């Protein structure tokens, strides 16, 4: 009962509106009647016959277009029924797609005059119960058409400015219009002054603003490809496309509106346009990706934001398309294959933006060109007769010379008593000190000859028994002995006592003479190197303590035994000691084989003559001549 009453009330309202349009309309009553019939209160789809009639009438002149926009705007403003409002929006959508481009211009002009035709943010249905979801869809549908009109205006401004967004748009087509049917009837027969004069020349149309006249005056603008646009133009188009996609995603019906047949019919052209919308967004994203790595930092940030927001929108678009396929809005084969924006691509773009941000903080310094040097002033010749001498200075006192700067006192460094960093004394340094001690000072007798003294004082710790003391003939003393140094008075350089020096050499000879019978080539208990011409030692003795055996006929300037020799000397010494050790082991084995019978066994083994160890020459007159240093008394 309530439904039938509502339908009856709707029919009465429609008939009343039609009657008022026929009587009160001054401009185009037929157009207003067709608009009322196309936006009736019936819960059915509008008849295509009335829509074609409206399209035909609006194609005649600009006046019909203006009347159509005014009538539809008044219909949307007064109605409180979501069915009437939805049919009116579907009519506007059809006119935007298939109508003349002047329809878009009229809506834009009405918007500039303050008449926001598609602004239905405050719409609320009052004719039906539980119609909140339907009213919400009407509001979102109107916002989608409004944003699409903004995109068309943006494209028109781009063409008027010499650029376009894509190659498929021209002559006011925003790229989402479907192919127009050839629904327009031939122009009606006109009078002769409208078609031409008797001479066959065309005349100007009588109605100002005729569609044909405007189309003839409109110039075709050159189309600019998307890749040749400036970054500002590309970002502007991307912003409009993304806002339009947001409005489309918000058109998804909820609640009871998902089961309404009228809403599903209104969704079909919107979903069809979203296919082209998705393709345009992908095209712009591809252009941004190609130019991303060559953009400025601010443009890179804008491109990254566009990619991030597009990734979220595409995820919602995939879910929306799944719902449309399940509901039956359009065929499944018509839907495009939507590709997601991978997180890996977003991470790569984000890392690049961060790198560009770091480089932007420290820009490269630009070399500033130095200003050109001013031309040197031209000096005028000076007249020497005009130059006057300066007067002498009065009470001129020269400034005192500056006081010399005091030299900084060097800090006294107290050496450490136990300085581990101090270098050890080498053998060469010790030899140099000893040589300076020998030859530093002049002789004590100043080069004068002194006769030998006839006293019996002993001047040497070693006296040759062959020299007889007390003889005055010094030539005979020199012939008989060369080692009698008792009468020598020569002083060494540096004040060195000759008695001390001679005693140093003679003391070694004395100890060598005393220990000759006990020494062997190796250690004190060695049997490998006995003295030539002598038998082995009487007993096997232990090695002598340090300091008891001294070497004779050795260079006094040789390196000290307390200082380790170089590595190559140690290696040679080790080879020699290894050889002697091997030889001594062989002799001990032979001695054991002989039964260890003492000197008898050792006598058999000492048949061959061996050399002295360590390069020490013999002093007993046997063997090869000594190779060391000898001290000879010059007297």
From Swiss-Prot:
Keyword annotations: Coated pit, Cytoplasmic vesicle, Endocytosis, Golgi apparatus, Membrane, Phosphoprotein
Record organism: Arabidopsis thaliana (Mouse-ear cress)
The name this protein goes by in its record: Probable clathrin assembly protein At4g32285
Residues annotated as domain ENTH: 23-159
Extent of Low complexity compositional bias: 165-174
Places the protein is found: Membrane, Clathrin-coated pit; Golgi apparatus; Cytoplasmic vesicle, Clathrin-coated vesicle
Region span, Disordered: 157-208, 357-412
UniProt-listed SMART domains: ENTH
């Amino acid at each position: 009962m309530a439904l039938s009453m509502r339908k009856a009330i709707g029919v009465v309202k429609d008939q009343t509106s039609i009657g008022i349009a026929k009587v009160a309309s001054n401009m185009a009553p037929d157009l207003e009647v067709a608009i009322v019939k196309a936006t009736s209160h019936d819960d059915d789809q509008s008849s295509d016959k009335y829509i074609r009639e409206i399209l035909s009438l609006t194609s005649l002149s600009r006046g019909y277009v203006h009347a159509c926009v005014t009538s539809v705007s008044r219909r949307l403003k007064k109605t409180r029924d979501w069915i009437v409002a939805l049919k009116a929006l579907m009519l506007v959508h059809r006119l935007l797609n298939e109508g003349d481009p002047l329809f878009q211009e009229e809506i834009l002009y009405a918007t500039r005059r303050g008449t926001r035709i598609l602004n239905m943010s405050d719409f609320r249905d009052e004719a039906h119960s539980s119609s909140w979801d339907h009213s919400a869809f009407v509001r979102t549908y109107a916002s989608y058409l409004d944003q699409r009109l903004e995109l068309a205006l943006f494209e028109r401004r781009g063409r008027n400015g010499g650029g376009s967004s894509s190659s498929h748009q021209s002559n006011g087509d925003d790229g989402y219009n479907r192919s127009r049917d050839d629904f327009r009837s031939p122009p009606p027969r006109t009078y002769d002054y409208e078609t031409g004069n008797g001479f066959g020349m065309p005349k100007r149309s009588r109605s100002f603003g005729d569609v044909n006249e405007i189309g003839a005056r409109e110039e075709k603008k050159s189309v600019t490809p998307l890749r040749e646009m400036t970054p500002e133009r590309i970002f502007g188009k991307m912003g409009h496309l993304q806002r339009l996609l947001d409005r489309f995603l918000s058109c998804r019906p909820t609640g009871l509106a998902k089961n309404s047949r009228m809403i599903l019919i209104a969704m079909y052209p919107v979903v069809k346009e979203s296919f082209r919308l998705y393709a345009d967004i992908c095209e712009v994203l591809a252009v941004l990706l190609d130019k991303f790595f060559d953009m400025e930092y601010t443009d890179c940030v804008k491109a990254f934001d566009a990619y991030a927001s597009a990734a979220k929108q595409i995820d919602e678009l995939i879910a929306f398309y799944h719902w449309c396929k399940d509901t039956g809005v359009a065929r499944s084969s018509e839907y495009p294959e939507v590709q997601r924006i991978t997180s890996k691509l977003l991470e790569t773009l984000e890392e690049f933006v961060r790198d560009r941000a770091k480089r932007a903080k420290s820009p490269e310094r630009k070399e500033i060109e130095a200003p050109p040097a001013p031309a040197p002033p031209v000096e005028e010749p000076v007249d020497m007769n005009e130059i006057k001498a300066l007067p002498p200075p009065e009470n001129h006192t020269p400034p005192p010379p500056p006081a010399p700067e005091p030299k900084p006192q060097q800090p006294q460094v107290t050496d450490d008593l136990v300085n581990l960093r101090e270098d050890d004394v080498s053998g060469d340094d010790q030899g140099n000190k000893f040589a300076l001690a020998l030859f530093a000072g002049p002789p004590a007798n100043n080069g004068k000859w002194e006769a030998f003294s006839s006293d019996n004082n002993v001047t040497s710790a070693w006296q040759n028994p062959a020299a007889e003391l007390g003889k005055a003939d010094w030539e005979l003393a020199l012939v008989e002995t060369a080692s009698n140094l008792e009468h020598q008075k020569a002083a060494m350089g540096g004040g060195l006592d000759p008695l001390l020096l001679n005693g140093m050499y003679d003391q070694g000879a004395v100890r060598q003479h005393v220990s000759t019978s006990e020494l062997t080539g190796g250690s004190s208990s060695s049997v490998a190197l006995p003295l030539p011409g002598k038998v082995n030692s009487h007993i096997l003795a232990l090695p002598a303590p340090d300091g008891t055996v001294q070497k004779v006929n050795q260079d006094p300037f040789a390196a000290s035994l307390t200082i380790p020799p170089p590595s190559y000397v140690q290696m040679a010494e080790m080879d020699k000691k290894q050889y002697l050790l091997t030889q001594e082991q062989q002799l001990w084995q032979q001695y054991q084989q002989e039964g260890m019978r003492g000197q008898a066994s050792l006598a058999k083994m000492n048949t061959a003559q061996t050399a002295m160890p360590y390069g020490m020459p013999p002093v007993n007159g046997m063997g090869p001549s000594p190779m060391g240093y000898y001290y000879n008394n010059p007297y």
